[in-house]
Amino acid sequence: MGRGGAGVVKFNLVDRIEHLSDERIVAVKYVSLAEEYLADHFPTFPVLPGVMMLESLTQAAAWLLHKRTDFACSMAVLKEARNVKYGTFVAPGGALRVEVELNKTTDTGATFKAVGTVGDGNGNGSSAVALQARIELAYFNLGDKQPALAELDRQLREHNRRRWAVLRAQSAEVAV
């Protein structure tokens, strides 16, 4: 899954945390023309692909799970996306503001209500919905089913803690 090996995220689609509580996270994904996937989506009208917007919601929800559990599990992956509705585009120079609210936790994951908005570019503070969805994440350790992978779980949890430390530092003025 990317150059870093199994379970390592290739595309980091959360650039900043604006708010974090036990039940809710607000994060931002800044869109730059330098992002490689924009070259093909679409060459004359580059916009953040819908699947990447959904992944941004998923990554924000994963950070909420990791923080709630003090990084108890190595894997937080999208299990199901329901009622996904796309609205406006997110173009380079724009920002996708992601709000994810915890709906329900289970022994194996959690469900969330999530929405991504983008400013109208007029500087008046109004925004439009880029997407909304109800998502379910599975939260687990690989070693739970294959004990030989317990060491990989430890490495992945440590990797996630290091990524969180960088993200937290970039969001320092916010209580995260």
List the predicted regions and their residue ranges.
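Conserved positions in beta-strands of structured domains
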Residues: 15-18, 82, 87, 101-103, ...
